[in-house]
Amino acid sequence: MHEPAFWHRPSSLLSRLLMPVGALYGAVAARRLMRTGMRAGVPVICVGNYHVGGAGKTPTVIALAGILRSLGETPVVLSRGYGGRLHGPVHVDPHRHTAADVGDEPLMMAWTIPVIVSRQRAAGIAPARALGASVILMDDGFQNPALAKDISLIVIDRARGLGNGQVFPAGPLRAPLPPQLARTDALVIVGFGPAADDVAASIGARGGLVLPARLIPDDASVVALRGRRVYAFAGIGDPQRFFRSLRACGIDVAAERAFPDHHPFSQRDVADLQTAAERDGLTLVTTEKDLARLRNSEDLAAFAQAVVAFAVTLAFDDEAVLRSFLTDRIGRARR
């Protein structure tokens, strides 16, 4: 879905009109947060958002998996598989499954990390442990009470923040902010800007850990696009962040097109992009997540060959602090 513009305005008539609905939605969500979930038998680290849409969860999960491996752990990702048709539980095989089967994010992560997709998260525990999981990395699901979480990390974009701070549909929040803050162990603030400062201060005041991080473009991606004029397109939670990242690397973005998050590209979409790029002599560029969806469609795979993926990795400003935190909290979870 495309986020409505009024979600990111301090005050609007439409937001005020929707506040009663948001209050009902928020009351239900807040009660769900109070429930105690099933214990997995191994430590569970949840990577989530306070709001709908994306804010860098997938690169955060990938970065955490690398750190956990360096600590001697065997992480397995547990995902709901948003956008996929399979309910699971299923062990994602990137050579066999498609984005239509398991969702684009699990498919992309499965190239480097074992991923279990399970619509019912609790049902994914046994297959994750069968893969040797010493730690389960839960991709999203912070507001889902099915599983008990030993560590909850929330990701926020520092340029975007939490919009108008209202609960869906009056704003982007999935639940009222206070009960979400109370269940947050660490806050990952990504990028640059002041929009997440108030939340970071609240987490710090509660004794939570605040972890600044940044998305680092892959050198090969930058080199591949240097000196070219590009047509950038993306169907992610915040396409504008992707476009800003390209420009920040000195890439000449001559045209851009934003699609809804997890957008299922059609032949018409592809034809429009290709026609415009060829007409103006532009190189097509998109995110790794979007390219994963394109490559895994038989009808669109040929088009995908002509598209450059702009790859990024997430790096924490102080990884040593995070490593110490994970070691301590995982150790506590095992006692």
From Swiss-Prot:
Pathway: Glycolipid biosynthesis; lipid IV(A) biosynthesis; lipid IV(A) from (3R)-3-hydroxytetradecanoyl-[acyl-carrier-protein] and UDP-N-acetyl-alpha-D-glucosamine: step 6/6
Alphabetized UniProt keyword annotations: ATP-binding, Kinase, Lipid A biosynthesis, Lipid biosynthesis, Lipid metabolism, Nucleotide-binding, Transferase
GO cellular component: plasma membrane
Residues binding ATP, per UniProt: H51, V52, G53, G54, A55, G56, K57, T58
GO biological process, one term: lipid A biosynthetic process
Signal peptide: none
Originating gene: lpxK
EC number(s) reported in the record: 2.7.1.130
GO molecular-function terms, A-Z: ATP binding; tetraacyldisaccharide 4'-kinase activity
One Pfam family from the record: LpxK
Keyword Kinase: yes
Family that this chain belongs to: Belongs to the LpxK family.
Name assigned to this protein: Tetraacyldisaccharide 4'-kinase
Catalytic activity: a lipid A disaccharide + ATP = a lipid IVA + ADP + H(+)
Function: Transfers the gamma-phosphate of ATP to the 4'-position of a tetraacyldisaccharide 1-phosphate intermediate (termed DS-1-P) to form tetraacyldisaccharide 1,4'-bis-phosphate (lipid IVA).
